[in-house]
Structure formats: C-alpha cells, structure tokens
Amino acid sequence: MTKTIDKIGSGEIYLQIMKTICGDVSDKSVIDLMCYHSPYIPQLGFSERTYVDIQDRKLDHKEEQQFFVLSDVFDFLNGNRKVFDFAICTDGIEHLSFKRGIELITLMTEQSQSQILFTPLGENMVNKKATHPDIHKSGWTPDIIDKHFKGYFSYIVMPNFHTTFGAFFFWRHNNLDKTNFVNDILKNLQ
C-alpha cells in the first residue's frame, strides 16, 4: 500500500504519523537505530527504549540518555540476541550506501516484530564518496525498497515534507489494519 500526502512536514506531523503507525506501545520495546538526538521517539510512550548511534550523541530528552548505546548499528545488531517489538530508523539509511542500507533493513526485519523507517525521498545532498557519518551516501524511493522487499512494506510518501525535497515513511506492522490506518492518518492531519 502506498499513500501520497501532499502536506509540508513538521515535527508535529511526523509525530502524529508515528503515533498512528505504532498505536498503544505502553508495554512495547523499541530500538531507535542511528538515533541522532531522538527528539520524537521518547514521546511515543514505549515502556522499554534503546537508542543506538555511532557518534556520542546527547539525546534531546536528558532522562533518556541512560538508554543510549554508543555503537555502530551493525556491530550492535550483529551482537544482539533480543527481539524488539519495534525497530525504528528515522533519517538514517540515507547515511549508508545502498548495500549497507539493505543490510540494515534486513537486520531490522530479523530483530523486531515491526519496522518503521523515515528517509528523504530520492537523492538529496548525496555524496557517495564521503566518509563522515553525517553525510548522505544514498537516496531512496519506495520503488527501490520494493525492488528488494517486494510487497513487504507500506508507504506514506510526502513529496513536500521538507521545503526543498520530499520524504517518506515505510513500515511493516503485524497488527495494523491498513485500510483504517489511511483514514486515521488523514483524519489526524486535518
């Protein structure tokens, strides 16, 4: 399922969509991969949280810092034995090569019941030769994701999420009624 929403994005819209995708998570665990400062994930209400980033980040919610793990996400996931309820990667996979991005998504599907990713739409500020972790190394579209994970994910495409480029959510959630979900998203964004 792919739904296009022609709205300019904001943190509030991001949070509304995430809350709708996740539902009640008061008894659920989450791993936030390539978390950056994780401004929104703490607001979703997960009972158990793990934040992983390769750089020593200070999280926006200071009380969450105790759950931060300084690690390469691949090292962390390859050594992990836990299955999380949710694995989230917001503005992360574009910082990896395509090959590593597909590898990350695959690890997420193996180590969580539900996966949610959010990334810029297409190639934006991409420098494939860069080595710094904050640089975009790939650009993604639903077609690229579907090429590797045919029919696995649902999509919300927002071509005007940012002022100069779009973004999209893609997710798989076992307990989500896709028909009602689209109606809920549209209702929540009005």
Where is each model-derived feature located?
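Short "lid" loop at the C-terminus of a central beta-strand within the Rossmann-like core
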Residues: 37, 120-126, 139
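A generic structural signal for short
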Residues: 93, 133-134
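Short glycine/proline- and charge-enriched loop/turn segments
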Residues: 126-132
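Hydrophobic adenine-recognition pocket in adenosine-nucleotide-binding enzymes
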Residues: 92-95, 120-121
